Amino acid sequence: MARAGGHGMGNPVNVGIAVQADWENREFISNISLNVRRLFDFLLRFEATTKSKLASLNEKLDILERKLEVLEVQVSSATTNPSVFN
């Protein structure tokens, strides 16, 4: 039990210091929480953008692979039957 006479948390100065420290801690925690939310939002946007760009690149790669297959067939035909191109 706290004794009267200015000792312990009953002292107005100590209470003021404790309240100020509590507010500083709450502000710090609030800032951390806000920054974590911002980071999370950024990561969600980054994931969506990255998925979209990768899907676009995948489509372009598929088109290039098909074109390459056609060219390989044409080269193969030209090598086995060169008279077609003369």
From Swiss-Prot:
InterPro entries: BRICK1 (IPR033378). GO terms for molecular function: identical protein binding; protein-containing complex binding. GO terms for cellular component: cytoskeleton; plasma membrane; SCAR complex. Gene3D superfamilies: 1.20.5.110. GO terms for biological process: actin filament organization; cell motility; regulation of actin polymerization or depolymerization; trichome morphogenesis. Signal peptide: none annotated. Residues 47-81 form a coiled coil. It is found in: Cytoplasm, Cytoskeleton. The keyword Ribosomal protein does not apply. Its main location: cytoplasm. Keywords: Coiled coil, Cytoplasm, Cytoskeleton. Belongs to the BRK1 family. PANTHER family: PROTEIN BRICK1. Binds SCAR. Involved in regulation of actin and microtubule organization. Part of a WAVE complex that activates the Arp2/3 complex. This is Probable protein BRICK1.
